[in-house]
């Protein structure tokens, strides 16, 4: 690291000729190229910002001083003093965002200004205020996002864009997408403006569309597409009503581009994940004719059933791709959780990584739930893939212990994360919103929370509905289903014999009353608060333990209701 920048040194440097200033800061920038913390007083940063602002428009110094600001802006502390309002405005101008004039005399100056703006937008409220205050910044930024595609670049109305070579254009285009991502992540009013601008979809998704139309993409192309998708999510994720940017035409176009990205064989998992997140935003309708194709009616024939099955599943490419990527992500989460269990004290970061991955799969479940709600074909397909007919081997272990997609989803539902709620809703939908079916596949322990939230606990003891359609239980499962513990979803241990075996009726009554007294004492001291199912189907607290026995329903005879009939 070079010497500390203190006030006397700063005054001495800027008191000299431009060549001296350029020489000093070139050396300082090189020495601090990888540094992110600086032993520099805030007063010195204030003075440095003022001095830089005075001379940065000197063509000899612009590039080197922008690089100095970029390096210093890695550290948030003291940055507001370094960035006075005039300096912020000049950085925006050099990034070609605050006016329609060509302020950067060289490509390298423009790129340095972009990098500088990326750091300062992220760390400085002052820079964000100046950025959002100028309506031109958003307009110019959105224009640039759509102007660097090769054919558009060659015919651009802006001279300096036409003169760029492909490598320079790709780099500058990527940096504008980075700026857009940060700007939309931190400015709600900025999000609103773009969400209601019809040009937003074309500007943002052009970079993604280009990648989906190629058989091979560079790392730069992939990174740019990822930034574009993350920006799209930022813009629309907070809106729950209609927005002007997503009309019927743009909705269909967006769904097509996102579908192509998710089903692509050449894009990375990061791009696919970002595309799935974009598909989950509330304002975007599920255009089934685009996402799943049109299901033609069967005209009959010798192989009518086979023809229907093939036609139905041939449109499930998107659904299968989402399920495949979901399973891949859940496998990573479960592996982290299994590794974390014995080492939680020694490696707390592992828990954080598992938690982050869990949060990132929430939108996968949201998309699947919306698709299943809108399409019975998707719902049937997901049921086949996630909860196929049970076999006896699967209930030898608890649901979360099975090495299946169903097992991994059950494992996620045990975590203190919002993802467990959307995962439970997805499973409930493919269970045809059947309380008994959900308990059968997940056990009451995993299902109770979601059913309580929906006020459906009161339906647990209702009789099942008979159906003559295809049974969802295999023959070997039927042979052992009476041995399955409905709470855990697994068969009882072989030695689970009753604790009351061998007792007389008087002994049983005595033990029962002891239990009642013990529970009542715990209730009075506040150790436990037993609950029962209220009239609204939700849990309410009981005043006495005997309320738990009052009006207890008789067990209803079990009938088959687990068909796939819609």
Curated annotation (Swiss-Prot):
Q: In which tissues is it expressed?
A: Present throughout the nervous system in juveniles and adults (at protein level).
User: InterPro entries attached here?
Assistant: Chaperone_Ric-8_A/B (IPR008376), Gua_nucleotide_exch_fac_Ric8 (IPR019318)
Supply the alphabetized keyword list. Answer: Chaperone, Cytoplasm, Developmental protein, Guanine-nucleotide releasing factor
Q: Name one GO biological process term.
A: regulation of feeding behavior
Q: What does this protein do?
A: Chaperone that specifically binds and folds some, but not all, nascent G alpha proteins prior to G protein heterotrimer formation, promoting their stability and activity. Also acts as a guanine nucleotide exchange factor (GEF) for G alpha proteins by stimulating exchange of bound GDP for free GTP. Able to facilitate synaptic transmission in the nervous system probably by activating G(q)-alpha (egl-30). Also able to activate the G(s)-alpha in synaptic signaling network.
What is said about its interaction partners and assembly? Interacts with GDP-bound G-alpha proteins goa-1 and gpa-16. Does not interact with G-alpha proteins when they are in complex with subunits beta and gamma.
The protein's name is Chaperone ric-8
Q: Which gene encodes it?
A: ric-8
């Amino acid at each position: 690291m070079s010497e500390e920048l203190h006030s006397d040194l700063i005054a001495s440097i800027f008191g000299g000729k431009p060549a001296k200033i350029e020489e000093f800061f070139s050396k300082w920038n090189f020495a601090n190229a990888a540094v992110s913390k600086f032993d520099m007083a805030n007063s010195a940063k204030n003075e440095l910002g003022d001095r830089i602002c005075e001379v940065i428009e000197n063509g000899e110094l612009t590039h080197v001083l922008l690089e100095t600001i970029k390096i210093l802006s890695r550290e948030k502390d003291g940055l507001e003093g370094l960035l006075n309002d005039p300096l912020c405005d000049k950085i925006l101008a050099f990034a070609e965002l605050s006016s329609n004039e060509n302020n950067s005399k060289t490509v390298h100056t423009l790129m340095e200004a972009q990098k500088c703006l990326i750091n300062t937008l992220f760390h400085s409220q002052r820079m964000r205020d100046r950025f959002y205050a100028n309506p031109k910044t958003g307009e110019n930024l959105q224009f640039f996002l759509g102007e660097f595609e090769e054919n558009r670049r060659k015919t651009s109305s802006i001279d300096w864009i036409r003169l760029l070579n492909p490598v320079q254009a790709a780099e500058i285009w990527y940096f504008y997408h980075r700026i857009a991502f940060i700007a939309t992540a931190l400015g709600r009013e900025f999000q609103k403006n773009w969400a209601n601008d019809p040009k937003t979809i074309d500007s943002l998704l052009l970079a993604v569309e280009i990648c989906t139309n190629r058989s091979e993409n560079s790392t730069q192309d992939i990174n740019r597409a990822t930034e574009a998708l993350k920006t799209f999510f930022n813009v629309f994720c907070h809106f729950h009503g209609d927005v002007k940017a997503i009309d019927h035409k743009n909705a269909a176009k967006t769904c097509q581009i996102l579908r192509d990205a998710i089903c692509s064989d050449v894009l990375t998992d990061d791009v696919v994940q970002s595309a799935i997140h974009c598909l989950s935003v509330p304002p975007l309708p599920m255009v089934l004719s685009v996402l799943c194709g049109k299901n033609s009616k069967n005209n009959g024939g010798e192989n009518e059933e086979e023809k229907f099955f093939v036609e139905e599943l041939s449109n499930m490419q998107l659904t299968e791709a989402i399920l495949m990527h979901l399973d891949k992500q859940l496998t990573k989460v479960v592996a982290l959780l299994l590794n974390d269990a014995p080492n939680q004290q020694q490696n707390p970061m592992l828990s954080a990584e598992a938690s982050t991955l869990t949060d990132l799969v929430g939108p996968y479940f949201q998309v699947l739930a919306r698709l299943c709600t809108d399409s019975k074909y998707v719902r049937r397909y997901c049921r086949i893939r996630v909860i196929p007919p049970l076999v006896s081997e699967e209930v030898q272990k608890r649901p979360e212990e099975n090495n299946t997609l169903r097992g991994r989803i059950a494992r996620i539902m045990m975590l203190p994360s919002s993802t467990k709620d959307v995962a439970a809703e997805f499973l409930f939908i493919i269970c045809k919103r059947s309380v008994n079916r959900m308990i059968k596949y997940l056990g009451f322990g995993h299902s109770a929370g979601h059913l309580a939230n929906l006020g459906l606990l009161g339906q647990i003891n209702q009789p099942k509905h008979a159906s003559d359609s295809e049974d969802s239980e295999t023959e070997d499962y039927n042979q052992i289903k009476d041995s399955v513990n409905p709470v855990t979803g697994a068969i009882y241990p072989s030695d689970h014999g009753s604790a009351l075996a061998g007792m007389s009726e008087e002994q049983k009554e005595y033990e029962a009353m002891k239990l009642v007294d013990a529970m009542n004492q715990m209730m009075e001291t506040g150790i436990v608060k037993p609950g029962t199912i209220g009239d609204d189907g939700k849990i309410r607290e009981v005043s006495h333990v005997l309320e738990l026995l009052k009006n207890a329903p008789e067990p209803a005879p079990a009938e088959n209701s687990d068909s796939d009939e819609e």
